[in-house]
């Protein structure tokens, strides 16, 4: 077993009818383990979330349904490997075994966490890969470049290849 702490951080969702009951169950279970901490954060807790992610070794996003959850991109951008449920937009952000791990069960998440905590070099490598992946695919600079290339292509309709110099 690894010497670690689990921090479950987030806020309530008004559009989640089961959320309050699930939260109660999580708090009840967490109260039995001194290494599990539940943090209920108010809206606009960006600084706290930033500090938690930066201080983490691994970021988890074990949703059973999820759009493009920013938790995953935030973790990757900060150089943390992310363990996430293989659902929705999470699958667009985690490259399994390259930037983190896609999992299908709590047991799978636990196994991958032990693997990462036992292998700091793998943790570092996945974190670096994740940061690069976010830089190349999800930052606004990438989108600006794509739009500039589109405008250049429209301005040069006969050319097959259009490039931006230095980008």
Features from the language model and the residues they span:
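Conserved acidic donor-binding segment of nucleotide-sugar-dependent glycosyltransferases
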Residues: 96-107, 115-120
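Short alpha-helical donor nucleotide-sugar binding micro-motif in glycosyltransferases
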Residues: 50-56
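Short hydrophobic beta-strand element within catalytic cores of glycosyltransferases
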Residues: 81-84, 94
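Aromatic "clamp/platform" in nucleotide-sugar-dependent glycosyltransferases that forms part
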Residues: 64
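Nucleotide-activated donor-binding/catalytic signature segment of Leloir-type glycosyltransferases, i.e.
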Residues: 10, 19-47
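A short hydrophobic beta-strand element within the catalytic core of glycosyltransferases
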Residues: 59-60
């Amino acid at each position: 077993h690894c010497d670690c702490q689990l921090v479950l951080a987030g806020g309530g969702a008004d559009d989640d009818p089961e959320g309050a009951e699930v939260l109660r169950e999580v708090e009840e279970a967490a109260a039995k383990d001194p290494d599990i901490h539940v943090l209920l954060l108010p809206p606009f807790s960006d600084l706290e979330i930033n500090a938690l992610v930066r201080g983490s070794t691994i970021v988890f996003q074990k949703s059973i349904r999820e759009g493009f959850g920013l938790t995953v991109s935030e973790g990757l951008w900060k150089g943390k490997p992310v363990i996430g449920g293989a659902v929705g937009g999470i699958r667009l952000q985690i490259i399994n075994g390259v930037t983190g791990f896609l999992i299908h069960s709590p047991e799978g998440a636990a196994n991958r966490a032990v693997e990462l905590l036992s292998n700091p070099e793998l943790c570092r490598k996945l974190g670096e890969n994740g940061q690069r992946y976010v830089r190349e695919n999800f930052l606004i600079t990438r989108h600006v470049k794509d739009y500039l290339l589109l405008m250049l292509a429209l301005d040069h309709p006969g050319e097959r290849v259009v490039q931006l110099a230095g980008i």
